[in-house]
């Protein structure tokens, strides 16, 4: 109430290079402005703050005369021939069709810069004493008959008293200019009803051999699952069906994730191309921006990156083109910062992968708790169509990722995946031959290893992500120091297990 929001917004937009058009005063002010030779009227308009302007429209013409014009005797003289009703009719620009159209026309003539129209309006316009310009407007659930009659008379709606009492809608005749205009506009927009397509052209799931390398043992070589994911994406670029659809999205840390190789392979999207020689141009993986680039490097804006991910993930519905957006971010900076966007993605039936890279609490401690994520899966679990996984080994990651491609782009299910990948380097075993392992990985849990030396007490140890490796160490300690057997379970998704438990519980009600 103390400020003037239109002026504040004008400064912001002008500072950003926009063309600004302000629609503040309606046509009924024109004569007064023409008669004012002292400049006091414009001065008074500039002095009054938004809180005062709200009161002027809530309290009637006499109040406006006394408190707006009454500040200066010259202004009282200016309106001395006007009744309180005349003063009450002095309108705001945002409710004057002539002024609004003039602003729109002016905006259409502007070239080279975007235009914003800032229009001054009245909260609860047309509601009369039941809500116009008063703070209870937002709590008003319905209008009484007296208020409806006032609304009808004010806007000259051609309804009888009985029709108003029955709360009937007014619809112009089919031959009226209004209906003709609306139908013409609707034809230009493609039809009477918006249409949402749930299916687009199928993207066939890549051949299994693309993922086979990820399912092999790394021997003594230590790797992080983040590194394995990047290798897997590099392999996917060789698939002619999938490669053009991949949209890697990075908010900031491409080199931290080991993704700099993508700069040369598929380029960073830039609508103007690259106008400079990058400082690392002599390196093999130098920075390359391109009009046809596929990588979206968003700068440090998780909200912007998430918006790009949603846009690409809903393109199957909006544009009949399935894209495969893969947004990689520090897992601590995902759902904790942009959880509302993730929920919106569920509402929009977005398809794609969210990768919470460098997850876990076993590394990155040098950067403080800001990177020690151990709870993002709790936040992702509340979104019904988000499938969350926390794999430990490369074969688990490959199995989950391929299943995601199959379910989202071949079966075209309305789900999306959140997968956390680690920063810790360690050896990765080969995928067990047991066929139940793949099913267990996808369902959320499978038996990884059993210790059966003593045939007595047996403890069940469960772990996911890097913590599974600590479970294996714990099993060794239990066996060697306490002579206790154990079963070690790899829990790839506590979230999926919970969903299954809820489903079973509901079924058994």
Positions of PLM-derived features:
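Conserved thiamine diphosphate
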Residues: 1-7, 11-12, 21, 255-256, ...
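Conserved acidic/glycine
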Residues: 2-302, 307-311, 455-467, 473, ...
